[in-house]
Amino acid sequence: MKNFKIYNINIKSIYKILLLIVAISIFGFFFLHLALYLMNHRNNLDIRNTSSNLASSEIRLPIVMYHSILKSRSGDYIVHPDTLENDFKYIQNKGYSTITMSELIDFVYNDSTLPEKPIIITFDDGNYNNLSYAVPLLHKYNMKAVISIVGSYTDTYTKSDEANPNYGYLRWKDISELMTDSCVEFQNHTYNLHSLKTGRKGCRKLSSESLETYTNMLTSDLTKLQNEFKENCNGYTPNTFTYPFGSISKESEQIIKDLGFKASLSCTSGVNTITKDPNCLYLLRRNNRVFGISSEQFFSKILE
């Protein structure tokens, strides 16, 4: 009887041990699969986050450059209103959304969002026909554009109060009214350096000019237009400088930055790659819209 009792106790102990082993195995199997699931889920999140970061930190940005919009004439810097409308249709059909320079700058500096396929439309010089033909089309297609004005042109037509789409330029009252329109943004195209008559091409430094003289000249000109914007447009200050003729000197960019401009526009063709580095906003490439070719012929080179 004594031996049987010991044997009975051993059987119970073995039974308990087996139950414990089974329980440990079940829980171990469960926790192993849970750990594997969590690791896999985390890896997937890392992959998605990496892709998202790459997408948000590197943006492909085409910029189109227009000047005058006219029905009566054609030329290298003149586009017919019908051509402009066809361009707008083509841009939208390709899935692109227009943005302003301020929205682009905000993306780089403040991590704001941009549409999936952004594009910037620019008009140089501030021709009055931009108001006559371009602005109604911007409204029609719910698009935005950047107009860079030459201050002396605007002052001249403000004084004469002449409004002629064939040869005139926007007056300050036109600009002030358009400032309240979300489809148009205004930028600085110099006060009086859009000329070849003085021996200086745009704002390029003369070979005989000292750095100090050049700095004072460019600072004075650009500041004059900045101040006129403040006076005529409720304190508004342009954040982007647009080079006349795309004429650039190696010294000019630092002066532009020192004056507080967050971006600059060149006339060099190509498509921009935008990152979170503020330096990518300077000397942005633009593509001049020439007359005589279809929207598809022009945009096939710069749109995906």
Model-identified regions with their sequence ranges:
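Sec-dependent N-terminal signal peptides
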Residues: 16-26
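Structural detector of well-ordered beta-strand residues that form the stable sheet scaffold
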Residues: 146-148, 187, 264-265
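Short, catalytically relevant binding-site loops at active-site mouths
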Residues: 152-155, 192-195, 247
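A short, conserved beta-to-alpha structural element at the edge of catalytic cores
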Residues: 142-165
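C-terminal active-site subregion of NodB/CE4 polysaccharide deacetylases
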Residues: 2-16, 29, 33-122, 129, ...
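Acidic (Asp/Glu)-rich catalytic clusters
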Residues: 136-142, 168-188, 257, 274-277
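Active-site-adjacent structural elements in enzyme catalytic domains
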Residues: 125-136
